[in-house]
């Protein structure tokens, strides 16, 4: 059983900065503005020879249960219940506040081992605050600077003293420590793509990002999938800020779900924090294999919906549209759905055969249908076609509709091979590739989809000039 440590405290004391320091990556958004973190995030961490799971939490604030701050506080309390040890953090530069005193009492009632952490202790204003910190009743404070990485050795010793050496090293093993030192998101994706078919896909978690405009029900959908209120939800638009990953299992398949911040139009994004959230969402989309684009069924196909779908297609991820809030459609007949499918084909012609499913995240209707489509599309996205089959297909399709003549000379399409999967990528050898019309490339791309049963999958085709066997002879002359 792994050791779990929760980092808690009032807003803007540096919890997310310490979280990033412990996991060795900038996973959590960090900003001077208080209340940046809203959902709890868990990740494998390492502190010298200690391996554990660390939970970043929202700042504790005094508020009613039904307010946004109150709901955030309830998620932090859930993290306290999940943890084996609590790091209670306060701002040494600001000193002890009445809020610190109130929340210290809350943490003490949990009965969990607690380490009092005095962050920002590098500041001159922090001198003497350790005496004041005794008023919290949590023992001697451990001074650190999460931003500069100071005092982490003392923090490691404090954790050991609080929970005991036997408990700390109970679950330590080589595999976990190696996993903490894993590559960044981008390196991991590149590594998987280089391995291609050598990597056993069934043993890797399927990465699914849930994206869309603000307030389309992304977090509600994921909560329904998990069967618990894991993510913060509410009527307010733009609740999610960080891209939160959660583990899930569907019919025996391990899945990693990514909840993302809603993407607004670029012209409306002014604040630094929202820009950071958007960048985090874009990273999650690039890291994912399948992206479920959540449309509000009561107001589908807004301009921003189409731009998000186009972004996913350009990134080469598997796009699947989910018409959420289907329970609010009065006439949810097959005719309505057929009309929406027709609009999909008309407004998103980049990928013919795009999958679109109706569902209700609030009531759980249509989730199995969504996941069946996800699994099917993921298999297509990973498909590899033999060169012999491809060239037989190419010969047939070119004979049926030859390339056009450019400046009186007909283009010659000679050879095709698949060079990658995820998404499927093909190289075609032809004469004068720079003059190949885009319309003929679309013809070849759609032909590939139809013949090899890959509807709704982004396909990339590159053209390469064929070798001229007489080029060397002409140079000799």
UniProtKB/Swiss-Prot annotation:
SUPFAM superfamilies with a match to the protein in the record: P-loop containing nucleoside triphosphate hydrolases
Coiled-coil ranges (or none): none
Residue numbers binding GTP 2: 212-219, 259-263, 324-327
Record keyword Repeat present: yes
UniProt KW keywords: GTP-binding, Nucleotide-binding, Repeat, Ribosome biogenesis
Domain of life: Bacteria
One GO MF term: GTP binding
Domain EngA-type G: 3-167, 206-382
Pfam families: KH_dom-like, MMR_HSR1
PROSITE patterns: G_ENGA
Recorded family membership: Belongs to the TRAFAC class TrmE-Era-EngA-EngB-Septin-like GTPase superfamily. EngA (Der) GTPase family.
Quaternary structure annotation from Swiss-Prot or TrEMBL: Associates with the 50S ribosomal subunit.
Biological role: GTPase that plays an essential role in the late steps of ribosome biogenesis.
Protein name (database record): GTPase Der
Organism of this sequence: Bartonella quintana (strain Toulouse)
């Amino acid at each position: 059983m792994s050791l779990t440590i929760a980092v808690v405290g009032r807003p803007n004391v540096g919890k997310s900065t310490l979280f990033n320091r412990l996991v060795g990556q900038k996973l959590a958004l960090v900003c001077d503005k208080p209340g940046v973190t809203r959902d709890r995030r868990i990740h494998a961490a390492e502190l010298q020879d200690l391996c554990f799971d660390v939970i970043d939490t929202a700042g504790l604030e005094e508020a009613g249960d039904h307010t946004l701050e109150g709901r955030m506080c309830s998620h932090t309390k859930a993290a306290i219940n999940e943890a084996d040890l609590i790091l209670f953090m306060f701002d040494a530069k600001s000193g002890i506040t009445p809020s610190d005193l109130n929340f210290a009492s809350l943490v003490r009632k949990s009965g969990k081992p607690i380490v009092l952490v005095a962050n920002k202790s590098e500041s001159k204003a922090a001198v003497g605050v350790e005496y004041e910190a005794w008023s919290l009743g949590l023992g001697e404070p451990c001074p650190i600077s999460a931003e500069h990485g100071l005092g982490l050795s003392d923090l490691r010793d404090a954790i050991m003293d609080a929970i005991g050496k036997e408990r700390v090293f109970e679950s330590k093993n080589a595999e976990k420590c190696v996993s903490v030192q894993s590559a960044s998101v981008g390196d991991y994706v590149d590594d998987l793509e280089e391995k291609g078919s050598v990597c056993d896909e069934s043993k890797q978690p399927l990465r699914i990002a849930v994206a869309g405009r603000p307030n389309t029900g992304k977090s509600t959908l994921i909560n329904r999938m998990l069967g618990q209120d894991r993510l913060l939800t509410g009527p307010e638009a733009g609740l999610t800020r960080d891209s939160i990953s959660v583990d899930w299992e569907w019919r025996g398949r391990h899945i990693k779900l990514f909840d993302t911040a809603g993407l607004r139009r670029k012209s409306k994004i002014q604040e630094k924090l929202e820009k950071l959230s958007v960048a985090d969402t874009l990273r999650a989309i690039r890291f994912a294999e399948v992206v479920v684009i959540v449309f509000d069924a009561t107001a589908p196909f807004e301009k921003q919906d189409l731009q998000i779908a186009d972004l996913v297609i350009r990134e080469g991820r598997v796009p699947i549209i989910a018409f959420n809030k289907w329970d609010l459609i009065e006439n949810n007949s097959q005719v309505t759905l057929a009309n929406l499918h027709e609009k999909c084909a008309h407004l998103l012609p980049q990928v013919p055969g795009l999958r679109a499913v109706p569902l209700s995240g609030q009531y759980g209707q249509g989730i199995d249908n969504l996941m069946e489509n996800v699994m099917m599309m993921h298999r297509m996205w990973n498909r590899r076609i033999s060169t012999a089959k491809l060239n037989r297909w190419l010969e047939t399709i070119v004979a049926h509709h030859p390339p056009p003549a450019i400046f009186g000379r007909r283009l010659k399409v000679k050879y095709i091979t698949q060079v990658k999967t995820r998404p499927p990528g093909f190289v075609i050898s032809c004469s004068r590739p720079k003059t190949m019309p885009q319309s003929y490339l679309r013809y070849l791309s759609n032909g590939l989809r139809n013949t090899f049963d890959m509807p709704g999958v982004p396909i990339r085709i590159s053209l390469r000039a064929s070798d001229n066997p007489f080029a060397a002879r002409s140079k000799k002359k």
